[in-house]
Amino acid sequence: MYVGKESIDRLRLDEAFAGKIAHLPIADCICVKCDERLLVVDDEETKCSRFGKEGDDVGKALMVINEKKREIVLLSIDNKLLKGIQGGIADCALFDDKQFRFVEFKTNAEGNAQKNFDKATSQLKNTIQVFRDRLQAVDVMFDDAVVLSCHIVLSHNFPRSMATTQNYQYEFATDTGGIMLSFDSETYWEKPER
């Protein structure tokens, strides 16, 4: 049994997302890789997140540095596991037996930066609550089972300031019980995001 399967079983994701809430079964929404460098993209054609491949725009991706080559599960959430969730939902999650990171892509966002930041943080908070509720229904305390964190992936030319991102990070942590929010387009997997 591989780490990804153990993580899915331990979190009881199949049970938590069985029935009417799920658009597709968990098994149809995951991909597992253990490469040293993993690119995660939100596919513009399928409108679903996936691991990247040659030719994908690195400027619109999350690069995961996985030096220990741990198995990382990509769970495609928006338009795959869940569809039409009121309040919006994160694009995907990356996880293993220790960490669970929600990812929201805003790489095509234009115009009002505050509006885009507000929408992305709202979608992430809503996703956290959906997962907390679904997992609690199957007796899994999500926040105790894994280290939770979130990423908002923006295009490199999206306007933002250090003060703005820090304010959003502080507000997000306050609103979610301490969950870290990152705006970096590159992350190290071994370093817990808490």
What are these regions (language model features)?
Residues I85-D96, A120:
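Catalytic centers of nucleases
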Residues Q114-S155:
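Catalytic cores of nucleic-acid endonucleases
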Residues N79-G84, A90-D91, Q136-V140:
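Catalytic micro-motifs at enzyme active sites that drive phosphoryl/nucleotidyl and oxygen chemistry
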Residues M1-G84:
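Basic, amphipathic N-terminal segments that precede the first structured/catalytic domain
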Residues K80-L82, N108-N112, N157-S161:
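Short acidic, S/G/P-rich loop/turn micro-motifs used as interaction or catalytic elements
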Residues C92-L94, Q99-A109:
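Conserved catalytic cores of phosphodiester-cleaving nucleases, focusing on short active-site segments
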Residues A113-D118, A163, N167:
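A short acidic/glycine-rich loop-to-helix N-cap element
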Residues E6-L13, F17, A145-R194:
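Domain-level recognition of nuclease-like catalytic cores that cleave nucleotide substrates
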